[in-house]
């Protein structure tokens, strides 16, 4: 590599400089404090793990996103984490092994071999919360509410939420007796809302079930969508109607708690179908082509670690949250400029001010170029009546 190119970073990999780094760190602390007030405990997971652990229960998409390396000590394949969620599931299932609900949260950098979308970062800062050990809709409502509180704290404007439930499609597909290949082809057609293809793929299915499957792709819109789904799926198998009623309970509670939040329902949108097992949700804002926060239920994710547990949670990219949010994250520097010197009294005053929480920058011996202004200081230490005193900078 030529010397002139040594500063280049790979596509989608960026560094965060001051003052933006200070804004992101302020936001991280505020959000983690919010999670703590809701009872969520912070966990810190490693950047690299053995691949089979890192990809447990996650499906092919995460495999394609994961950078892979060989551990020189064991010879086993390892992965650089592309998603923290499976790691937290391992912590809950294998390390903590708690009985009853467990609330965990996290914040850390992840690395993607492929970007989520064109011109997006491959090194987001993933932040999220997970609730393990409860299969009721109350836990889904809690994590969705926490996600919305996080967005409100960040002052992200004009949010709207998409809600769905993969159990509705899964229940119909199983009742129809579709093979794995046929179910996958139908799933692909559902995502494209290819009505002719959906009709062709369900031509050999029992007519009432075929009609329900074909209707799913058209069941999208506002709250009226759920009323229409109740009519269309009235004779559906029990797992389907139970999934629909769970979705309705969640939607009703969210409407009560957040009456101004626009809710959109698409029963044919199967985001995370191979990973999630119940409700799925995502938050969007105008002008951004992908969700800014997303999550859902993924029961039994801990099975690969020897302890299956119901689970629900959400995640977001902290850098995206900060860039979209309007919250005041003051990154302007202030501080006290201290002159260079070996005076013990000066050192004691500097130490005292730092212990009190002040930012103090001391000049270096013979330095050139740095001044109180370039160091971000708005005050200075001056010797006055043989005492080191904080004073405004001379104008």
Swiss-Prot record:
InterPro entries, per the entry: aa-tRNA-synth_II/BPL/LPL, HisRS-like_core, HisRS/HisZ, HisZ
Could you identify this protein by its name?
ATP phosphoribosyltransferase regulatory subunit
Q: Biological process GO terms, please? A: L-histidine biosynthetic process
Assembly with partners or alone? Heteromultimer composed of HisG and HisZ subunits.
Q: What extra comment accompanies this record? A: This function is generally fulfilled by the C-terminal part of HisG, which is missing in some bacteria such as this one.
What pathway is this protein said to act in by its record? Amino-acid biosynthesis; L-histidine biosynthesis; L-histidine from 5-phospho-alpha-D-ribose 1-diphosphate: step 1/9
Q: Which GO terms describe its cellular component?
A: cytoplasm
Annotated localization = Cytoplasm
* UniProt keyword Cytoplasm present: yes
Described by its record, this protein's role is as follows: Required for the first step of histidine biosynthesis. May allow the feedback regulation of ATP phosphoribosyltransferase activity by histidine.
**Gene name in the database record:** hisZ
Which top-rank group of organisms is this from?
Bacteria
- Stated family: Belongs to the class-II aminoacyl-tRNA synthetase family. HisZ subfamily.
Give one Pfam family, short name only: tRNA-synt_His
Q: What are the protein's UniProt keywords? A: Amino-acid biosynthesis, Cytoplasm, Histidine biosynthesis
